[in-house]
């Protein structure tokens, strides 16, 4: 039996130095392994507006992907640094400033969570890692063995379901 829990550790999320949460100010990192790859701040500096918009849609189903990606690229063009979690959070809030006052607070909170999720998935190549895991899963299971995979968002869910159909 194989059990795969695809969720992020709360120890990582609750540590401001890891940059996983918009609720705590810290460096905008989001890497599961801080020694590997590039941080989310570095990724934002190199991503094109349309690529960022696609990332927000594909990795997090973000309904305000266009507005957020425009705000991020506009800020970067003006020389603004987006190196901290609060800097990104504030840009998201600015991007959603057009919303009615009674909807804004909740929308900002949800868009922050989705944006941080989308960036985390991107900088850690989480979908590629999950695809590789799913490809190797049949070889790791004993004949007649079972696997349970706990997903936490629709992107993971879609990928796992698609892979399971091929088994």
Task: Tell me what each language-model feature is.
Residues 1-167:
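S-adenosyl-L-methionine-dependent methyltransferase catalytic core, i.e., the SAM/SAH-binding region
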């Amino acid at each position: 039996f194989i059990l795969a829990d695809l969720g992020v550790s709360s120890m990582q999320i609750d540590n401001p130095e890891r940059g996983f949460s918009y609720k705590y100010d810290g460096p905008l990192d989001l890497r599961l392994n801080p020694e590997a790859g590039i941080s989310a701040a570095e990724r934002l500096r190199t991503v094109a507006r349309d690529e960022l918009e696609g990332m927000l849609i594909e990795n997090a189903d973000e309904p305000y992907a266009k507005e957020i990606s425009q705000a991020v690229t506009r800020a970067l063009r003006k020389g603004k640094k987006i190196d901290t979690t609060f800097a990104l959070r504030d840009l998201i809030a600015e991007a959603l400033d057009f919303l009615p006052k009674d909807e804004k607070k909740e929308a900002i909170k949800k868009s922050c969570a989705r944006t941080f999720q989308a960036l985390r998935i991107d900088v850690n190549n989480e979908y590629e890692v999950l695809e590789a895991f799913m490809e190797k899963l049949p070889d790791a299971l004993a004949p007649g063995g079972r696997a349970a995979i706990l997903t936490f968002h629709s992107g993971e869910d879609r990928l796992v379901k698609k892979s399971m159909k091929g088994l």
